[in-house]
Curated annotation (Swiss-Prot):
Mediates the induction of a number of unlinked genes involved in purine utilization. Binds to the consensus sequence 5'-TCGGNNNNNNCCGA-3'. It is found in: Nucleus. Its main location: nucleus. Gene3D superfamilies: Zn(2)-C6 fungal-type DNA-binding domain. Residues 170-182, 189-207, 260-269, 367-377 have a biased composition (Basic and acidic residues). GO terms for molecular function: DNA-binding transcription factor activity; DNA-binding transcription factor activity, RNA polymerase II-specific; sequence-specific DNA binding; zinc ion binding. It comes from Emericella nidulans (strain FGSC A4 / ATCC 38163 / CBS 112.46 / NRRL 194 / M139). Residues 1-48, 163-207, 251-282, 367-391, 811-862, 877-969 are annotated as: Disordered. GO terms for cellular component: nucleus. Pfam families: Fungal_trans, Zn_clus. The lineage of its organism: Eukaryota, Fungi, Dikarya, Ascomycota, Pezizomycotina. This is Positive regulator of purine utilization. Keywords: Activator, DNA-binding, Metal-binding, Nucleus, Transcription, Transcription regulation, Zinc. GO terms for biological process: DNA-templated transcription; positive regulation of transcription by RNA polymerase II; purine nucleobase catabolic process; regulation of DNA-templated transcription; regulation of gene expression. InterPro entries: Transcription_factor_dom_fun (IPR007219), Yeast_MetPath_Reg (IPR052202), Zn2-C6_fun-type_DNA-bd_sf (IPR036864), Zn2Cys6_DnaBD (IPR001138).
Length: 1060
C-alpha cells in the first residue's frame, strides 16, 4: 500500500508538471517497465528534506479526496491508496464522489490513470507493438498542437502527436482517435485541469488562444463562393459560428453517460449550473457557464422519422431552414452506414432536428391514448408518447452540440456548401433557442447568425450569372458582327446555380425572420436595415421540385408548406417597417429635446424612409393598418399548405402586430402638449395631439389584447400552445395592453362589461397557470398580471364603471375645451428653451400646491418585489399603508347622483373576485384624481422638461374625466406614490441636474436612489430606462432572450409548438 509518510519520495510526471509532489513507492528496477511513466528517472530535489515541506504545503491542493463511504458516515478518511483503512476493514470499494455529476469516481484520477496507462503499455509490449515513451513535456509537440496542425498519422511521434488511423480488418475502415482524449499528454492535462484551479485557468486561456488563432487564420482565407466580391469577410463563417459553439458547448457534459434531470420540471440549482451570482455581463454572454446535461442516445429509424416529421409539419413551415428532401437523404445515408462512419455534420443536423421535433410533442396523459387504441391521426400522433427511448429536447440538443465543433472545424464535404451549411447550423440552434433557453441567449444567437449572413453577402443579390447575363463576364464570346457579348451557360450549371441561389435566399429570409421576431419582442434595433436588402424571396414550390439540377415546374395548384412561410415573411417585413418608424420617431424626439452636442452633427430634419410619400404619421399608420388587414385576409388555406401547421396562429400574429402598431401611438399629457415645440408634418401622435382618433387607438389596443388572449385560450384547449416562452411573452404583453386601455379610456370601459373583462383576465391567468410547469417564468407573469388586473378593475368600478353606465358625453365635454386650447397654443407659437423651462417650473409649482391641498389618495401596491425574490424593502412596504389582501366584495356606494351612472348593486362572481377600491372622494365631486405617469415612457426619456424623469413621482392631479389622457404606453400606476410629491425638486435646481430616480425604486424595493427599473424584456416603455448600474434588470423570462442563469438551466419541459 502507498503510505504518504514515506520518506523516500518519487514523483510522477504530472506532479512535476504541476510543481507539486505526491509520494510514490520505490519500485524495484527489475519490476518496473522501462516505458512506464511512473518508473522514469526524474530529477530529485537538491535537498531530500526539502521535499517534505513541499508535501505539507500542497495539502490544500491534494489530488486524493476523501472516499464516499467516509463522507456519508462523516468519518475522517486517512486517504490511503488504493483503499483507506476504514474501507479496507469493511471489505468494500473505496471510491470518491463528484458533487457535480452526482456519481462515484476514482479517489485519485492520477493514480487511476497511471495504473491504467501502465496496464495498456504492458499489453502493447506483450503484443510486440512499439510506442513512444512518455516524457514530462514535449515542447515541439505542444507548439504544433497549439498551432492547430493536423497530426501526422503514421509518423514516429505516434498517438501523442495527433490522430492515428487504425485499420479494421473486417471492414477496412479507418477509425480516427483524438490525441487530446486518448494520448498520455491529454490524460495528464485532464487530471491537472480537474484538480488544480490555476491549471484550469491556464487551460481556459489556452482554449481562448486556440479560437483566436483559428479566427486569425480564417481571416486570411481567400474569398470564394460569394455572389458579391465586395464582401471580403470570412467566407467560411467559422470565425462567427465558433463563437456560438464556445458559448453553447458548455451546456453539455464531456461524458454522455452523465444523466441530468429526467422530468421536465426538475431543474438544477444554480450551484450545479455554475451561474450563481453571475450575470450575462460577468460571464461574457454565458461563455463561462457549465451546466451538466446528459446526451440522448441516437434514436432508431422509426423514432427518428417521426421526430423529423414533427419538425417538418410544425416548425419548418414557419421558418423553412431545412430542405426536406435533402434532409431525408441525409437521414437515409446516416442510417445506412456503421455508427463509427457517421460524420459530425450528419450527427449535428439530425440531433438538432430531433431536439426541435421532440419539443413539439405536447402530452399530459399518453397512457390513456395507448389504452384506448386510438388510430394515429395527425392530432393523435402529436400527442402520442413515442416510446421509452424518447429523450427530452435538451438531451438531443446536448447530443447535437458535441458534434458542432467537429462539424465546423472540418473541411466542406463534397455534397455540402461550406459556410452556408454552417449558417444553417446556427439557424437551427436559434430555432431550438425558441424552444428552450440556451446560452448565450436567443438575442445573441440570432445576432451571430445575422452577422454571419451579412458576412456571406446573403442580403445582396443582383441576379448576375442567371437572370442578368449582361453583368457577367464568364464564357463570353463576340460574334462576327461585333454584337453585344452573350453568356453561354449549360443547363447543368444553370440548374446548380438556381439550387444554390434558392438555398441562399432561404437562409437569408430565415435569418431575417429570426432577427425581426426577436427584435420586435424585446424592442431592440434590427441587425440590418431593410434599405440594404435586395435579396428576393425563395421559391414557393415544395422542396421536392427544387433539386440540385434545377427547379422543376410544379403542377397547377400543388400544395406547398412554403405558403405559410411566405406569409410569415410578409408579416416580418410589415413588423420591420412598424418598428423602424416607431424607433425613428422616438429617437428624433429625444434628439430634439436632449442637450446640444452630438445632435449638432446629426441631420435632425431627416424622417424615416417608410414615411416618405405620406403627409402625416396618421396617414402612414392607417396605411399600415390596411395592409395588416389585407395580410390577415390573404392567409393561405389548409389545402394550399399541405402540412398540419394550424393556420389560426396567423390571425394571432395579426392582432399582435396591431398592438405593436398602436402601443406607442398614445397621447401626451395635456400639460406636456403645450410645452412641446410644434412638431413637423410627419410626427407621431405620441408627440402631438391626437384628439381626433384617441378613442379609436384605445379601442384597437383593447380589442387586439383581448383577441390575443382569447385565441391563446382556444389554442391551449386543443393543446396547440407549445411555444411556451413566446406564448408567455405574448400573453403578458397582450394583457398589459388590454388593462392599459381600460385604465385610461372611459370609451373602452363603456364598450365592455365587467363579465367580459373578468373572462379575459381569467383566460390569460388560466393559460399562464397551465404553462407554469413547462415555462417556470409564467408564474411570475401570472402573479403580476393578476395584481394589475385587480387594481385596474377596482379603479374602474370606483370611477365610471363598465358598460352603458359610463357617461361619455360628460367626459368628452370636460376635456375638449382644454385640448382645443392646448392644440391652438401648441401650433400658434414656437417656444424657446428658456420659456419652456420657465413654464415647466410654474406648472410644477401649481401641481405641488394642488397636491398639498388634496386629500390622500389610495396607493396601488402590486407587491412586485415578491415576484422577484428581493425583500429588501418589505419593511418599508409594511409600514407604507399599502393595500392588503382584500377579501370583501365590492361595497356599493351609498352616494347618489342623478347625473352619474353607477354599476348596479347585483352580485356576480366577477365582482366577488375583486376587492374594494377605497376612494375617499365622492364620484360626483370635482375632486382631483391622480394623473398616473409611466416614468420612462418614450415621451419622457431624455426629456429635461419631464417632471417624472426627474423624480419618478406623479407630478399633478386631474379630474376623473381627464384620466383617459395618458403619458405613454405603460404600467404607470405601479410607481404611484402621492406621499412623495412634496419631496419633488424643481427642474431648475442644481440638485436635480442628473434627473435621479427616487420614488419608483423605493416602491419596488430594489435599491432606492438607483434607476434599476423593471426590464421585463418585452420592449415596452419600461425598457427605455437607462441602466446606470452593473446589475441586470428584472427578467421575468429568466434569460430566455438575453442569457443569464435562466438560459442554462435544463429541463423546462416541452415548450416548442405550432405558432410563434
Amino acid at each position: 500500500m502507498l503510505n504518504p509518510s514515506t520518506s523516500d519520495i518519487h514523483t510522477s510526471p504530472t506532479a512535476v508538471g504541476n510543481g507539486r509532489k505526491r509520494p510514490h513507492p520505490i519500485a524495484d528496477s527489475g519490476s518496473a517497465m522501462p516505458s512506464d511513466p511512473s518508473a522514469q528517472q526524474l530529477p530529485h530535489p537538491a535537498n531530500e528534506s526539502a521535499a517534505i515541506p513541499s508535501i505539507a504545503s500542497s495539502s490544500s491542493f491534494r489530488n486524493v479526496s476523501a472516499c464516499n463511504r467516509c463522507r456519508q458516515r462523516k468519518n475522517r478518511c486517512d486517504q490511503r491508496l488504493p483503499r483507506c483503512q476504514a474501507c479496507e476493514k469493511a471489505g468494500v470499494r473505496c471510491v470518491g464522489y463528484d458533487p457535480i455529476t452526482k456519481r462515484e469516481i476514482p479517489r485519485s484520477y492520477v493514480y487511476f490513470l497511471e495504473s491504467r496507462v501502465a496496464y495498456l503499455e504492458k499489453v502493447l509490449m506483450d503484443n510486440g507493438i512499439e510506442y513512444n515513451e512518455a516524457v514530462a513535456f514535449d515542447e515541439e509537440e505542444a507548439v504544433k498542437i497549439e498551432a492547430g496542425y493536423e497530426a501526422y498519422a503514421g509518423s514516429a511521434n505516434g498517438p501523442a502527436a495527433g490522430e492515428i488511423a487504425a485499420q479494421d480488418g473486417s471492414n477496412d475502415k479507418s477509425v480516427r482517435i483524438k490525441k487530446e482524449k486518448n494520448g498520455p499528454l491529454g490524460l495528464e492535462k485532464a487530471s491537472r485541469y480537474d484538480h488544480d484551479p490555476e491549471v484550469k485557468q491556464d487551460s481556459d486561456a489556452e482554449d481562448g488562444w486556440r479560437i483566436q488563432n483559428l479566427v486569425s487564420n480564417i481571416g486570411m482565407v481567400s474569398v470564394q463562393g460569394t455572389s458579391d466580391p465586395r464582401y471580403l469577410g470570412s467566407t467560411s463563417g467559422i470565425s462567427f459560428a465558433r463563437v456560438v459553439f464556445a458559448a453553447v458547448k458548455s451546456s453539455v457534459p464531456g461524458n454522455s453517460s452523465e444523466r441530468g434531470p429526467s422530468r421536465p420540471k426538475e431543474r438544477l440549482p444554480h450551484s450545479a449550473t455554475g451561474t450563481e451570482g453571475s450575470t450575462t455581463r460577468d460571464s461574457f454572454f454565458g461563455l463561462q457557464t457549465r451546466p451538466m446535461m446528459k446526451c440522448a442516445a441516437f434514436p432508431d429509424r422509426e423514432l427518428a422519422e417521426r421526430l423529423a416529421d414533427l419538425y417538418f409539419e410544425h416548425a419548418n413551415p414557419q421558418i423553412p431552414i431545412v430542405h426536406r428532401v435533402d434532409f431525408m437523404e441525409l437521414l437515409d445515408r446516416t442510417y445506412s452506414v456503421d455508427e463509427k462512419s457517421r460524420s459530425p455534420r450528419s450527427l449535428y443536423f439530425l440531433n438538432i432536428v430531433f431536439a426541435i421535433g421532440s419539443g413539439i410533442i405536447f402530452e399530459d396523459k399518453p397512457a390513456e391514448d395507448q389504452k384506448e387504441g386510438r388510430d394515429h391521426s395527425p392530432s393523435a400522433t402529436k400527442r402520442q408518447r413515442l416510446s421509452s427511448r424518447q429523450y427530452q429536447p435538451e438531451e438531443y440538443h446536448a447530443s447535437a452540440i458535441v458534434h458542432l465543433e467537429s462539424f465546423l472545424s472540418t473541411s466542406p464535404t463534397t455534397d455540402g456548401f461550406g459556410a452556408l451549411e454552417e449558417l444553417q447550423a446556427v439557424l437551427l440552434l436559434a430555432s431550438f433557442a425558441l424552444l428552450r433557453p440556451v446560452a448565450p441567449g436567443l438575442w445573441y444567437i440570432v445576432g451571430v447568425a445575422m452577422r454571419l449572413a451579412v458576412d456571406l453577402g446573403l442580403h445582396y443579390e443582383d441576379g448576375a450569372g442567371i437572370d442578368g447575363p449582361e453583368n457577367d463576364n464568364m464564357n463570353r464570346t463576340n460574334n462576327k458582327d461585333g454584337e453585344k457579348a452573350k453568356l453561354r451557360i449549360d443547363d447543368h450549371e444553370r440548374g446548380r446555380r438556381e439550387w444554390v441561389r434558392d438555398f441562399r435566399r432561404r437562409l437569408w429570409w430565415c435569418c431575417y425572420s429570426f432577427d425581426r421576431l426577436v427584435s420586435c419582442c424585446v424592442g431592440r434595433p434590427f441587425g440590418i436595415s431593410d434599405q440594404a436588402i435586395s435579396t428576393e424571396f425563395p421559391s414557393i414550390l415544395e422542396d421536392k421540385y427544387i433539386t440540385k439540377s434545377g427547379i422543376i415546374k410544379a403542377p397547377e395548384g400543388a400544395p406547398s408548406y412554403k405558403h405559410s412561410a411566405f406569409h410569415y415573411f410578409k408579416l416580418r417585413v410589415l413588423q420591420s417597417e412598424i418598428q423602424d418608424v416607431l424607433q425613428h420617431q422616438q429617437a428624433r424626439f429625444a434628439r430634439q429635446r436632449g442637450p446640444p452636442g452630438a445632435r449638432s452633427f446629426m441631420r435632425l430634419d431627416v424622417v424615416s424612409p417608410f414615411l416618405q410619400g405620406f403627409d402625416s404619421f396618421r396617414s402612414w399608420r392607417r396605411d399600415v393598418d390596411r395592409r395588416l388587414l389585407e395580410w390577415k385576409n390573404s392567409a393561405p388555406m389548409p389545402s394550399e399548405n399541405g402540412v398540419r401547421f394550424p393556420l389560426e396562429f396567423l390571425e394571432l400574429n395579426y392582432w399582435q402586430a396591431v398592438i405593436m402598431l398602436y402601443q406607442q401611438s398614445l397621447t401626451v399629457p395635456a400639460e406636456l402638449a403645450d410645452e412641446l415645440s410644434p412638431a413637423e408634418d410627419v410626427s407621431s401622435p405620441s408627440f402631438s395631439q391626437v384628439e381626433e382618433d384617441e378613442h379609436d387607438i384605445y379601442y384597437k389596443v383593447a380589442e387586439a389584447g383581448q383577441k390575443v388572449i382569447r385565441i391563446y385560450r382556444q389554442m391551449h384547449r386543443v393543446r396547440l400552445v407549445n411555444y411556451t416562452y413566446l406564448a408567455t411573452h405574448h400573453i403578458f404583453m397582450a394583457g398589459i395592453s388590454f388593462l392599459y386601455a381600460i385604465w385610461h379610456s372611459p370609451y373602452v370601459r363603456s364598450r365592455l362589461t365587467l363579465d367580459e373583462v373578468d373572462f379575459t383576465v381569467l383566460a390569460a391567468t388560466s393559460v399562464l397557470r397551465d404553462l407554469m410547469h413547462k415555462c417556470p417564468p409564467a408564474e411570475a407573469c401570472r402573479d403580476a398580471f393578476e395584481r394589475m388586473s385587480k387594481a385596474t378593475v377596482e379603479m374602474s368600478l370606483s370611477t365610471t364603471g363598465f358598460g352603458p353606465q359610463v357617461e361619455l358625453n360628460r367626459v368628452q365635454t370636460s376635456t375638449s375645451g382644454s385640448r382645443q386650447f392646448n392644440a391652438t397654443q401648441s401650433r400658434s407659437r414656437p417656444y424657446s428653451r428658456q420659456q419652456a423651462e420657465q413654464r415647466q417650473r410654474q406648472s410644477a409649482s401649481r401641481r405641488q400646491l394642488q397636491m398639498r391641498q388634496s386629500r390622500p389618495l389610495p396607493r396601488f401596491d402590486m407587491n412586485l418585489e415578491d415576484l422577484f425574490g428581493d425583500n429588501r424593502a418589505v419593511a418599508e412596504r409594511q409600514g407604507s399603508g399599502g393595500m392588503g389582501k382584500l377579501a370583501q366584495p365590492y361595497p356599493v356606494s351609498e352616494t347618489s347622483d342623478p347625473n352619474f351612472a353607477r354599476p348596479q348593486s347585483h352580485r356576480n362572481p366577477s365582482m366577488e373576485y375583486y376587492g374594494p377600491f377605497e376612494n375617499p372622494v365622492s364620484p360626483q365631486q370635482p375632486q382631483p384624481q391622480p394623473r398616473y405617469y409611466y416614468n420612462n415612457s418614450p415621451q419622457q426619456s431624455g426629456s429635461p422638461g419631464s417632471v417624472v424623469a426627474a423624480s419618478g413621482i406623479p407630478p399633478y392631479q386631474v379630474t376623473p374625466t381627464e384620466q383617459e389622457n395618458p403619458s405613454g404606453m405603460g404600467l404607470d400606476y405601479l410607481d404611484y406614490d402621492p406621499t412623495g410629491i412634496e419631496r419633488q425638486l424643481s427642474l431648475g435646481s442644481e440638485e436635480n441636474s442628473d434627473f435621479k430616480f427616487q420614488g419608483g425604486a423605493q416602491s419596488l424595493g430594489h435599491g432606492a436612489g438607483h434607476n434599476f427599473g423593471i426590464d421585463l424584456g418585452f420592449g415596452m416603455a419600461v425598457d427605455f430606462q437607462h441602466d446606470w448600474s452593473e446589475n441586470a434588470n428584472y427578467d421575468l423570462l429568466e434569460g430566455y432572450f438575453f442569457g443569464g442563469a435562466g438560459a442554462t438551466g435544463p429541463g423546462h419541459g416541452h415548450g416548442h409548438g405550432s405558432g410563434i
